[in-house]
Design a protein with these regions (language model features):
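Conserved phosphate-binding/catalytic region of the ribokinase-like
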Residues: 18-22, 70-191
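Conserved beta-alpha-beta core of the PfkB/ribokinase-like small-molecule kinase fold
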Residues: 2-80, 96-97
């Protein structure tokens, strides 16, 4: 929502969404709510709900869910979240792990126990590493609803571990591990 504040950037996003859709891209949306940037919370709520149905993958946190849906229960919120083109909901809960939902499957993965020193960029790292896995495996938007519980669990586990390494370091992008670091710091990817 940072770049959706009423400005030319909001309209640039709509144009980019149209172009990406026409090119066959998977569209993901992480509302990443930043209340101080919005003079009116209702306007923020309406804007997020304007963009949410345009996406294939919605990533939101346990802190964002109540504001967007009026409930702290992700499973109670799912019927509302599966609107428009939404095919996959990713729900992050910090040190408690993450969940993934399609209309027919769901998965959970715990986060490794680590001592966090800086959580800046953790949400971006989670969605980025999740999208990387989809790209690596050649998953298309049409295939998102067919992802199995096993595959979703594998993706969540990888992204949780990616973030577990990241939050043990200072900074955002600078804290993101390489694939080699992923293998050595969690070899053989133990919990």
């Amino acid at each position: 929502s940072v770049s959706l504040v009423d400005s030319p950037m909001r309209y640039a996003h709509l144009a980019a969404i149209t172009a990406a859709r026409e090119a066959g891209a998977i569209l993901s949306f992480d509302p990443n709510l930043r209340f101080p940037l919005w003079p009116d919370r209702e306007q923020l709520h309406q804007t997020v709900w304007q963009f949410l149905p345009l996406t294939h993958i919605l990533k939101l946190s346990d802190e964002e869910l109540p504001f967007l849906t009026g409930t702290e229960d992700i499973e109670a919120a799912l019927p509302r979240l599966f609107t428009g083109d939404v095919q996959l909901v990713l729900y992050t809960c910090g040190s408690k792990g993450a969940r993934a939902y399609t209309r027919t499957a769901s998965a959970r993965a715990r986060s490794p126990k680590v001592t966090a020193v800086d959580t800046t960029g953790a949400g971006d790292g989670f969605i980025g590493s999740f999208l990387w896995q989809l790209q690596r495996d050649g998953v298309t938007a049409a295939e998102l609803p067919k992802l199995s519980r096993k595959r979703l669990t594998e993706y969540l586990t990888f992204s949780n571990r990616f973030c577990a390494i990241s939050v043990q370091r200072h900074g955002a992008i600078d804290s993101y591990p390489t694939l080699e670091q992923m293998e050595t710091e969690f070899s053989p990817f133990q919990e």
